[in-house]
């Protein structure tokens, strides 16, 4: 059995025929791996996984009056769904490997089977549609979908993934149809490029269709970044985003992290701006989007972290189009932080605690946001309001393969000028294999 040694970007994995070892360098995971000269051996030594998940959601929101069946994120709703996820990725055949995954969901219960759901403004709900409360998070005609599936090339310095991939950056947090390139041929540097045609969700708690990120231009959305490490403590990152006819953006982020034994302390500062175009927010007539965020944190590796920070958005259109593919800036979980996502001139102060031991992990975020509603073109500025928000997550493993999860969101405080107060509870049970 002929084998070759390559560098790969993965963590520790072990099966009967091979071992993959990894080390962490400059925030990315790099390691040695066996690459096979035979396609058959690469496929035989791949790894498959799956899960069966029961997941439910209840929102204590506003009740519809009369025969009105239209609902939004603030409406009272409840549902229970079951889903099955399957995934496989091969070992490397020389410089190549493949990955494929699927998820299918079925509705077990809906509090209101006749409710009608629309997209609204929140970009976490792209082109939402459907009937019944489960359509809040699981679009009616998109309940059996291809998940993360791609072809990957890796030669030691360059990684290229093409297909349906998970994009993760300051302004991306979801699956996209596109190409992701990463290169580390320059000393102490990481160069990344991401091209996106469509984006969407295929998760146990959310399944949407995949929609064109730029219906006005066939070029799609492109992100490019350059990150440079200064010694072992500091790094600086510059990036740009182009989505022709909609917006262009640029940003810079500086970070510092010091480690001693198993403990660490760090801070980061980040600024970004969007330049809105003809089909951007307010058709580019109300200025540009802005983001400023600062974060400090301290923690113990693989056990606990405490962090706090500030986030501010632009005074006219908030983040503008920066959040087109989501973000990793907001400390709130995927269903929270609406005032920051949709409001303008937002000022968020927050604290966050994360803890994990054995099979139990939890996270809690508390934040207070002062913000205004977005004004239309030539409309006077709207008044400020404030909303306080707590997000809580508890993930506990009963056994190695059987686990449960609880998520809670609650908003309170302020005058409810733009959003009513609400409580949202998610419950899930997962059998992994």
Predicted regions and their residues:
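Aromatic (phenylalanine/tyrosine) cluster motif
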Residues: 6, 10-12, 32
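Beta-barrel outer-membrane channel/assembly domains of diderm bacteria
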Residues: 27-160, 182-183, 259-261, 354-365, ...
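Outer-membrane beta-barrel pore domains
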Residues: 62-75, 240-244, 249-433
């Amino acid at each position: 059995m002929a084998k070759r040694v390559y560098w790969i970007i993965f963590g520790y994995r072990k099966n009967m025929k091979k071992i993959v070892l990894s080390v962490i360098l400059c925030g990315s995971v790099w390691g040695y791996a066996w690459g096979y000269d035979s396609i058959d051996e690469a496929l035989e030594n791949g790894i498959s996984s799956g899960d069966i998940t029961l997941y439910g959601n209840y929102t204590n929101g506003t009740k519809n009056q009369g025969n009105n069946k239209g609902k939004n994120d603030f409406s009272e709703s409840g549902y229970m769904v079951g889903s099955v996820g399957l995934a496989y990725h091969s070992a490397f055949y020389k410089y190549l490997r493949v990955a494929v995954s699927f998820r299918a969901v079925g509705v077990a219960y809906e509090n209101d089977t006749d409710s009608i759901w629309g997209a609204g403004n929140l970009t976490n709900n792209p082109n939402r549609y459907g009937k019944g409360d489960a359509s809040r998070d699981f679009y009616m005609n998109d309940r059996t979908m291809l998940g993360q599936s791609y072809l990957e090339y890796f030669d030691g310095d360059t990684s290229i993934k093409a297909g349906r991939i998970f994009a993760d950056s300051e302004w991306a947090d979801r699956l996209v149809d596109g190409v992701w390139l990463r290169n580390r041929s320059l000393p102490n540097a990481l160069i990344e490029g991401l091209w996106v045609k469509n984006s969407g969700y295929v998760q146990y708690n959310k399944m949407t269709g995949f929609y064109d990120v730029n219906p006005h231009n066939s070029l799609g959305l492109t992100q490019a970044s350059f990150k440079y490490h200064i010694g072992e403590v500091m790094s600086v990152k510059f990036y740009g985003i182009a989505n022709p006819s909609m917006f262009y953006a640029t940003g810079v982020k500086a970070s510092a992290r010091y480690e001693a034994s198993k403990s660490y302390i760090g801070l980061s500062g980040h600024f970004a701006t969007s330049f809105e175009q003809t089909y951007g927010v307010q058709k580019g007539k109300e200025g540009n989007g802005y983001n400023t965020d600062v974060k400090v944190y301290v923690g113990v590796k693989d056990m606990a972290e405490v962090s706090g920070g500030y986030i501010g958005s632009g005074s006219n259109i908030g983040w503008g189009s920066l959040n087109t593919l989501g973000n990793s800036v907001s400390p709130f979980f995927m269903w929270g932080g609406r005032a920051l996502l949709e409001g303008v001139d937002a000022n968020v102060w927050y604290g966050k605690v994360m803890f994990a031991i054995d099979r139990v992990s939890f996270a809690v975020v508390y934040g207070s946001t002062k913000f205004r509603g977005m004004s239309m073109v030539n409309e006077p500025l709207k008044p400020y309001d404030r909303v306080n928000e707590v997000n809580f997550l508890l993930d506990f493993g009963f056994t190695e393969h059987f686990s449960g999860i609880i998520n809670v969101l609650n908003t309170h405080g302020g005058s409810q000028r733009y959003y009513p107060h609400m409580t949202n509870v998610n419950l899930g049970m997962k059998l992994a294999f």
